[in-house]
Structures are given as C-alpha cells and as structure tokens.
Amino acid sequence: MRPTLTLLLFLSLTLPLAAQTDPIAAGDAAWARRAEGHQGPRALPGPVDEAIAAYERAVKEQPDRLEGTWKLLRALHYKGEFTTDSNDAKQKIFARGKEAAEAGIDRLAKRAAVSRQKLEALSPAQAAKAVAAVPEAKPIFLWSAVHWGLWGDVFGRMAAARQGVGDKVRRYAEILIALDERYEDAAGHRILGRLHTLAPKVPFFTGWVDRDKAVSELRRAVALGPDNFDNHVFLAEALFEYQPAKAAEARDILRRLILRQPTPELVVEQEKSLVNARALLAKHAG
C-alpha cells in the first residue's frame, strides 16, 4: 500500500512540473482556459496571451517540433478574432501570424525533405503528396491560409488582391483539401468558399474568383462538416450575395442555426457565429 501511495504522490507532483517545463504542455493548459471570463463572443486576452507566449517559446526552443508552430498560429488567430475589435491590433496580430506561418512552412518543407522552392513549384495535389507523411502538415496549411486571409481582410481586400494574398490563400486551401477534405469540419472547403465569396475580382490578379464556386465549396463544407457553425453562416451569406433567388434557403439555414446551443469547448467561437447569423438574418429579413 505504501509504495502505491508514494507513486501516486510522485505523479501528482511531477505532472504539473512537466506542464511547466514543456512549453507545449503549458500552452495547451492555457489554451484550455481561453474562454474563462468571456462575455458572449468576446474573450479576455490573458489566457490566450499565456498560450501564445508558451507556444512561441516552444517554437524558439524546439523549432523542428511542428506542433508548436500550428498551435501558435491557432492561438494567434483566436487572439485576433475574439479578443479585440481594433483594426490596428488585428493587422499586427495577423501579420505576426502570417510571418509565423511562412516560417512554419519552411520547417515543414525541411521535415518533408523537399526544398521550399520546389514545394512552391508543385501543384497543390503534388505538394500535398510531398508533405503527406508529416502529421502537422494539415493544421499548418489550415492556419497559414487563415492568417493570410484575415490579414488581407484587415489590410484591405483590394490592396491584398494586388499583392497576391488571394493566390496564397487559395493554394494553401487547395493543398489542405488534397491532404484531407474532411479535416477540421472541411476547413479547406470553408476557406476556399469564403475566399471566392469575399475576394474582389481584379483583372490580372484574381481573375480566377468564381462566385458560383463560393456556393459549391460552402455546400461541400456544410455536407462534410455540419457541426461547424461558420460553414452554415458563410453558405447563407454567399447565397444572399450571389444567388439571391435562393434567399429563402439562406434564411432557413440561419433560422435553424440560431436555435442551436454552443458547445462548452467552443463557446466563444460559436457565440460569434451566432451573433453573425442573427445580424445576417436581420439584414436580409425579407
């Protein structure tokens, strides 16, 4: 009995110590508290700032451990989306995110034993095949696309289009789809559909923008990821904007969504989706 008690005591003392010495474990612990003290869709910055600091330490101390990279990108996204409404603050956060994303893709290419230059020369399907053996490839391309897209939004969509931001978001989303179209509630289709919804169509820069593709990609996202609130909101918005004859369908999508309750693990994220759904429904009340 005594050895068992001693072992339990040892474990109770060493597990918190492990969380303190391993920056990713420390970041995960802070990330789990990200919604503490939230008011609806607005989170307090403290917990996610703690997570960001821990993940940044992980990237600095263990750069080849790619888990730290994608978790840093995820935490930066949360900070930019859910803790501030300041455009200047968002620009800084998402600029920081896209820089971390590009550095992360460099390390991903190295892990996959392919040069970054060669990776960029491959088609999305070929690039996905080149990095498929690296488990972190999917979240790295997901969050890289997100940061580039959101940085483009706050920087200015027209200016971003002329700088090739849309091309980068499209490529990363297509690589993610080639890796796993179901990943994170069909995130690749969600990102690609959102891009085709919001990106301005600028000759010689974003001539590939296709509003019908926006709807088809978002329908695919809803089909593969019905539990993701944003899939529904984004589809409804695309229908209102580009297929107004289907406005009744869009309203029905939103009405069904706002009857749902947020899950505890995603309370802030889903509260924001519901706020956006209600605003969109009010705007297109019919």
Please tell me what each predicted stretch does.
Residues P63, A109, P135, E181-Y183, ...:
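Short coil turns that delineate tetratricopeptide repeat
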Residues A221, D230-N231:
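Extended serine/threonine-enriched, polar tracts that run as long, contiguous segments within proteins
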Residues G68, I140, D185-G188, N231:
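TPR alpha-solenoid repeat register
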